Amino acid sequence: MPSSTYPRRRFDEVFLVEISSRILVTQEKHQQEEEEKKVRMAGKANVSVLMSEDASFHQKVAVEKRLKIGEVILRFAMIALALVAAVRVGTDTQTRTIFTIEKKAKYSDMKALVFLVVMNGIVASYSLLQGLRCVLSIYTQSPLTSKPLAWLIFALDQTMAYFSLAAAAAAAESAYLAERGQTEFQWMKVCIFYEKFCHQIGEGLVSTFLVSLSMATVSGMSAYHLFRLYGSKGKSIQ
């Protein structure tokens, strides 16, 4: 009896060891699968984050590119408008005979119109330089990253916007007096004698106000380019 019991006990021990080892292997395999699942989930999460960041980056690049193209268009449009205003006003003359006296009206007779012509010439030259800078920036794909340069461009754009508006306002006031006169000071209406002269001045004024509006828009773009350097902690968008 004892001799028959020993092999069975030995068999039971071997069987238990085999079962235990299989259970351990199964547990280790299950644990490994769980870890691999966690790694895959973390990888998917990282991919989602990277895709989201990439989409946000490309969206910013698209906005930046559209702004640059819009700025180029506006700056070259200002060149054309400023030149039109300067030429129309600067070449404006008309000669009339009033009571046997020949009178010649020209833009230099009114200081406000002289200021208008000079200011439009300055704006056209400045817009040409800035427009070429923008074209070069787009061609070389080199964004504006220098804060001092961004501040300089912003300040110059603001100055040009204010001065062009001041020139347009001063010329408009003079044109109004020429058109309506001033009875309190016994200033007569000049445009009833120099109709062509006044119409040409009006065309120059319209162009100058369009220049002022365009320059104000460009100033807003310059403000965006400047303050994004602080908002993104100096990181530029390629």
From Swiss-Prot:
Disulfide-bonded cysteines: none
Organism superkingdom: Eukaryota
InterPro entries recorded: CASP/CASPL (IPR006459), CASP_dom (IPR006702)
Annotated transmembrane regions: 67-87, 112-132, 149-169, 201-221
Record's bilayer topology term: Multi-pass membrane protein
Membrane topology (Extracellular): 88-111, 170-200
Record topological domains on the Cytoplasmic side: 1-66, 133-148, 222-238
GO CC annotation, single: plasma membrane
Record localization: Cell membrane
Record keywords, A-Z: Cell membrane, Membrane, Transmembrane, Transmembrane helix
Family of this protein: Belongs to the Casparian strip membrane proteins (CASP) family.
Assembly and oligomerization: Homodimer and heterodimers.
Protein name: CASP-like protein 2BC2
Annotated source species: Picea sitchensis (Sitka spruce)
